């Protein structure tokens, strides 16, 4: 039985004003247990394409966001290697291999955009 991995856009505030642009993610991605899914995060050459500072967060309802990937493809200690990150041009991707029930969550991407601003 398939379930949806719900995705929301991550809007961040930078240098005292709302960031001019936001990264684009699909509204939802679905998969069945054991399958692999890839979540895309499209930006511009000013953020995703210009820096290798893309991070991914997982958030379950009522819980704080958890860092899953940083610097495009690095995993913090304790994050299963089922989670992997990559980047091509202005698009970053999070791939979850061997989906498990606990992977159902919101996933957010974030990218450095220069001048201490994040999208």
UniProtKB/Swiss-Prot annotation:
Classification from the root reads: Eukaryota, Metazoa, Chordata, Craniata, Vertebrata
Kindly list the GO CC terms recorded for this protein: extracellular region; immunoglobulin complex; plasma membrane
Primary site of residence: secreted
Per UniProt, what is one GO molecular function of this protein?
A: antigen binding
Which parts of the sequence are annotated with region: Complementarity-determining-2? Answer: 71-73
Tell me which positions the record assigns to the signal sequence: 1-19
* Superkingdom of the source species: Eukaryota
Which protein are we looking at? Immunoglobulin lambda variable 2-11
This molecule's function is given as: V region of the variable domain of immunoglobulin light chains that participates in the antigen recognition. Immunoglobulins, also known as antibodies, are membrane-bound or secreted glycoproteins produced by B lymphocytes. In the recognition phase of humoral immunity, the membrane-bound immunoglobulins serve as receptors which, upon binding of a specific antigen, trigger the clonal expansion and differentiation of B lymphocytes into immunoglobulins-secreting plasma cells.
Residue segments, region Framework-3: 74-109
Where can this protein be found?
Secreted; Cell membrane
Which residue ranges does the record assign to the Ig-like domain? 20-119
Q: Where is this region: Complementarity-determining-3?
A: 110-119
Q: Which residues carry this modification: Pyrrolidone carboxylic acid?
A: 20
List the InterPro entries hit by this protein, alphabetically: Ig-like_dom, Ig-like_dom_sf, Ig-like_fold, Ig_sub, Ig_V-set, IgV_Light_Chain
Q: Framework-1: where is this region?
A: 20-44
The chain's coiled-coil residues are none
Secreted is among the record's keywords: yes
List the GO biological process terms.
Answer: adaptive immune response; immune response
Task: Please indicate if the UniProt record lists Secreted as a keyword.
Answer: yes
Which cysteines link up through disulfide bonds? 41-109
Binding partners and assembly: Immunoglobulins are composed of two identical heavy chains and two identical light chains; disulfide-linked.
